[in-house]
Each structure stands twice: as structure tokens, then as C-alpha cells.
Amino acid sequence: MKVTLEQLIRAAGELPPMPQAAQKALQLIRDPEVNMGEVAAVLAVDQVLSSLVLRLANSAFYGLPGRVVTVHQAVMVLGSNAVRDLLLASTVAGYLSRPLPGYALPGGALWRHALGVAMGARWIFEKRRWKGTDEVYYAGLLCDIGKLPFEKLLRGVQVEAGEWLHGSFLEMERQHFGIDHALLGAEIGRRWHLPDELITAIAHHHQPAEAPQHQKMVAAVHVADAAMMMMGVGVGVDGLRYVLDRDALELLNFEESEMEELIRQVTDQIYLAELFLSDRAPGW
């Protein structure tokens, strides 16, 4: 069953919009000289976002001696980077938290996977002290956004018994629809006016050798994605069908021993995120 790109994009158009408060706050945070009081004022009008920043600021992770009771206090404690990450993670949770039976994924699985890829890719960049840690985080968070419009179509495909035993969902997407979720996700990114480096990382995170530019970012997302698959985080029945690109490891100068460290770091961070975003990711 071949479908047009426009049909798939229309399906993507059904995704819920980003809350206005989150949009405005993220816009403010892009300014390096942002007044966090303005950010607090924007977040204070959104009950869910307010509760998230207060919950994180009062967590044992920050270990404050007294209780944070206002959104203004919370954003001052957290800082712009933590607030930004929380807003993006919360928003994407709304997209990726639903069950995706077409991919054999329960509720929350794809979201957990996306968060792990984002954190893992950023950890790789931070450890190497490379610029672009924010961008690689966003690329990891959005790398599988193309699965959402595909999922409904996959449910309608009559797959012969045992067909999944010999291939991946990626291969099945190409076979049945002529495009895969990575390329569709990149097209969604273009429609959302994402930066070129994010679009490239989304498009090539399964085949990093094909990336025409931003190769280190693509490689970091690819390796972090592979780490999540090794952990069994947010993968379907085809989880072992994907091959880790050794050239990507070489490009990153990534030692095998680092994989264990990456997995350990990401496991702790996912657990922390679960504590504060559970009401945004049903099914956890």
C-alpha cells in the first residue's frame, strides 16, 4: 500500500500542539540574557507546567533546606537550562506517550526511548566538551517523531505471520509505504521549521554514514539510540534487528567501555524524569 508524503504529513498534523505557555517560555529562554522572572510569569498561568517546575525544584535531587512554594522561586532554583529541558520533555511526552500497537509499543514506551536517546546523545557531547549539546539533545528527543503518523497505517497492514522475524519495522515501512519514519520525521521537522542539523539527525539516525553534514550529531544520536535498544527501552519486537554502525563509534572516538557508563547515566536520569513527568506520560 503506497501512500503519498502529503497523506502522511496530514496524519502528522493530528499531533497535539505545544501548549502556548511552553512555546512562550521556550522563546524567552532562547535569549541568553533572559529575565527568568518573565519565564516564571508565563509558566504560572499553566497549572500543569507550574506543578512540574515546583515538583522538580522541591525534589531530593536539588536538596534544598526549605520548601519552594512559588513558580518564581522554582525557576530561579532550576535555571534556564533545566527549565528548558523540562518544558521540551513535557511537551514531547504528550506526543510520544500514547500506546503504539502498530509498533508493538505500550503507552509511555516510545517517550521513554526518546528521552533516553536525548540524554545519551547529550552525554556523549558533554563528555567530549563539544559544542551543540542542546541541539543534539533535541535531535534525540525528536528522532522518532515520524513513527506517530506511520503507526495508524501499520495497524492497517496485513502482515504475514512470521514476516517480522526476518526484518525490522524500518524495512517494513519502506516496503509498504516507500518511505521510513526517519525520513518522514525529517519532513515533519521541515514543516515545523526546525534547524537543519536537527532535520539531518532525524533523517539519518539509523544510517549515520549517509548524513551529508552534521555527522557527529547524527552519530551521537545513532549510538544513543542503539544504547536504548540494548537496554530494551522503548523497542518493539524488532529491537535486535538494528545494527550499530562501527564508523559512528570511530567518528565519536567512542570506546566500548563507555557504553556501560552511558547506560548507567541515562538509567538514572530516566528514573528522575519518570518521577516528575508521570502525569504527562500516561501509562507509566
Where are these regions (language model features)?
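Terminal helices and disordered tails flanking the catalytic cores of nucleotide-processing hydrolases
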Residues: 1-7, 246-284
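Conserved alpha-helical "signature site"
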Residues: 1-158, 162, 167-243, 280-284
